């Protein structure tokens, strides 16, 4: 913030400030737990590894832990992540259904210029061969 002549604002962590708040705020005080809390990941990938160290490392190796930027952060950190915030990450949903502006009409040529040239050459010259 020194760029804007703002000083003495303390340590700023822009990534942490943009992160989603996963805990719900309550006014009641909870009693102190007597045991350690269970190890459950905050990003929702618990069902993949189920607290198994070997399953977790296998999931990391096979890239099974699906965490998209819009699941972790409230707003995109970079311009490259901006597109993933629009994208639906449901496995059964196609992007064309959620964002109709992606779809473009296709005008295919059944007979291209090269195909027409070949057909014309074959009809006019019996000895014509491409090779």
Curated annotation (Swiss-Prot):
Microtubule inner protein component of sperm flagellar doublet microtubules. InterPro entries: SPMIP11. The keyword Cytoplasm applies. GO terms for biological process: flagellated sperm motility. Residues 18-44 are annotated as: Disordered. It comes from Homo sapiens (Human). It is found in: Cytoplasm, Cytoskeleton, Flagellum axoneme. GO terms for cellular component: axonemal A tubule inner sheath; sperm flagellum. Microtubule inner protein (MIP) part of the dynein-decorated doublet microtubules (DMTs) in flagellum axoneme. May serve to reinforce and thus stabilize the microtubule structure in the sperm flagella. Disulfide bonds: none annotated. Pfam families: SPMIP11. Residues 21-33 have a biased composition (Basic and acidic residues). Keywords: Cell projection, Cilium, Cytoplasm, Cytoskeleton, Flagellum. It comes from the Eukaryota. This is Sperm microtubule inner protein 11.
């Amino acid at each position: 913030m020194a760029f804007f002549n703002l000083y003495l604002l303390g340590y700023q962590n822009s990534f942490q400030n943009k992160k989603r708040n996963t805990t719900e705020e309550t006014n009641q005080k909870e009693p102190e737990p007597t045991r350690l809390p269970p190890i459950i990941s905050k990003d929702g990938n618990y069902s993949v590894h189920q607290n198994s160290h070997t399953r977790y490392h296998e999931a990391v190796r096979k890239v099974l832990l699906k965490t998209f930027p819009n699941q972790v952060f409230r707003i995109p950190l970079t311009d490259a992540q901006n597109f993933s915030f629009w994208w639906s990450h449901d496995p059964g949903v196609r992007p064309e259904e959620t964002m109709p502006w992606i779809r473009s009409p296709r005008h295919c040529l059944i007979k291209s210029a090269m195909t027409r040239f070949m057909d014309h050459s074959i009809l006019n010259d019996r000895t014509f061969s491409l090779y």
